[in-house]
Amino acid sequence: MAAPVKKTGSKKSKKNVPNGVVHIQSTFNNTIVSISDTSGHVISWSSAGASGFKGARKGTPFAAQTAAEAAAKRALDQGMRQIEVLVRGPGSGRETAIRALQVAGLEITLIRDVTPLPHNGCRRPKRRRV
């Protein structure tokens, strides 16, 4: 029988990226945090679902905080120090995610809300009757 092939770990090089952009997409069901460099290449990302939350717990502020901490930790390992934050969506995890990034040690230089607003575009879904 042939000798087992040794698998080597990931060959991702550690980049030194001092500043970048954090995109926080916060919906009612989940929060996704993506950290990229200034040219748009994603350095790290995390979400409430990837942090181990399932179902309705993904939409909570605590889940957003956990996701932001995980993404920030990986960005700090790449040498990131200053960030601009772009927030999108109406979810409950917006503020907690920003606060978690600040506590993790990233210096926030700008916070911008980029939630898309329709100029009376598509018809909205019908109202829920519970």
UniProtKB/Swiss-Prot annotation:
One function term, GO molecular function aspect: structural constituent of ribosome
Keyword rRNA-binding: yes
Keywords, in A-Z order: Ribonucleoprotein, Ribosomal protein, RNA-binding, rRNA-binding
Keyword RNA-binding assigned: yes
Alphabetized HAMAP family for the sequence: Ribosomal_uS11
Subunit field text: Part of the 30S ribosomal subunit. Interacts with proteins S7 and S18. Binds to IF-3.
Protein name stated in the entry: Small ribosomal subunit protein uS11
Annotated source species: Prochlorococcus marinus (strain MIT 9515)
